[in-house]
């Protein structure tokens, strides 16, 4: 059994980026932007309404406060401040999720914050502290072996390892930085093959050609890549054809 997640609600005002309606017909978990890198109250409400209507689990996609940089710029935020900002974002999304009759079911950092918490124990602990501050014991999505998942487990939270079908991996099992050529896999057939490899074999081919073991409970297909909805649909169809069960982890 594997979960399919995608980043949704990444727009604000008259600007839109992701095809939320189409993706919500495919994925089982929606990482909803909470206003710090994208998303505004109207967008958050609409995505929560659609997700609840279709039985898709709602997750808080928390970020550094970086609208101009789409949450992808490296920042140094004091731990107490970051914890408060994470809790704030979860709380904001919770209002709209509960109004739609659904809970916020998990938390996933976005962009630079996600990458930072792979190696930075202080920032990882701050994210976990923010999850705790927001109340409940929400699962946390992160890269296998990351400081974030370790910090979550130490705090009594469930750490959920995920894989990225449309991102390139290093031989060490980390994501190739977006600043490097080839970091995003855009060939649709390749994305489908990689998704199957993750789900069936528990591994993926790294940029140097070696096989990297990746034990994932959730598979991410980014919503902001070209033809994202079509790729996600192809991934789901291929997984189901291979006999892989599809279902939310939370």
Curated annotation (Swiss-Prot):
Its EC number is 3.5.2.9. One of its GO terms (biological process) is carbohydrate metabolic process. It catalyses: 5-oxo-L-proline + ATP + 2 H2O = L-glutamate + ADP + phosphate + H(+). GO terms for molecular function: 5-oxoprolinase (ATP-hydrolyzing) activity; ATP binding. SUPFAM superfamilies: Glycoside hydrolase/deacetylase. Keywords: ATP-binding, Hydrolase, Nucleotide-binding. InterPro entries: Glyco_hydro/deAcase_b/a-brl, LamB/YcsF/PxpA-like. The keyword ATP-binding applies. HAMAP family: PxpA. Forms a complex composed of PxpA, PxpB and PxpC. Catalyzes the cleavage of 5-oxoproline to form L-glutamate coupled to the hydrolysis of ATP to ADP and inorganic phosphate. Belongs to the LamB/PxpA family. This is 5-oxoprolinase subunit A. It comes from Streptomyces coelicolor (strain ATCC BAA-471 / A3(2) / M145). The lineage of its organism: Bacteria, Bacillati, Actinomycetota, Actinomycetes, Kitasatosporales. The gene is pxpA.
């Amino acid at each position: 059994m594997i979960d399919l997640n995608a980043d949704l609600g990444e727009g604000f005002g008259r600007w839109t980026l992701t095809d939320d309606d189409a993706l919500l017909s495919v994925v089982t978990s929606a990482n909803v932007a909470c206003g710090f890198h994208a998303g505004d109250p109207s967008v958050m409400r609409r995505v929560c309404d659609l997700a609840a209507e279709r039985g898709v689990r709602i997750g808080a996609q928390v970020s550094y406060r970086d609208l101009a940089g789409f949450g992808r710029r490296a920042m140094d935020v004091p731990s107490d401040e970051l914890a408060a900002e994470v809790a704030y974002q979860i709380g904001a999304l919770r209002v709209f999720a509960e109004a739609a009759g659904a809970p916020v079911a998990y938390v996933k950092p976005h962009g630079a914050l996600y990458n930072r918490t792979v190696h930075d124990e202080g920032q990882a602990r701050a994210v976990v502290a923010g999850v705790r501050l927001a109340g409940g014991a929400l699962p946390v999505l992160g890269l296998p072996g990351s400081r974030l998942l370790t910090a979550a487990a130490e705090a009594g939270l469930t750490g959920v390892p995920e894989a990225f079908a449309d991102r390139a991996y290093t031989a060490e099992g980390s994501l190739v930085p977006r600043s490097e050529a080839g970091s995003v896999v855009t060939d649709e057939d390749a994305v489908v093959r990689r998704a199957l490899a993750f789900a069936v074999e528990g591994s993926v081919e790294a940029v140097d050609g070696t096989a990297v073991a990746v034990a994932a409970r959730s598979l991410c297909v980014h919503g902001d890549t070209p033809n994202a909805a079509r790729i996600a649909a192809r991934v789901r169809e291929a997984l189901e054809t291979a006999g892989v069960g599809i279902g939310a982890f939370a």
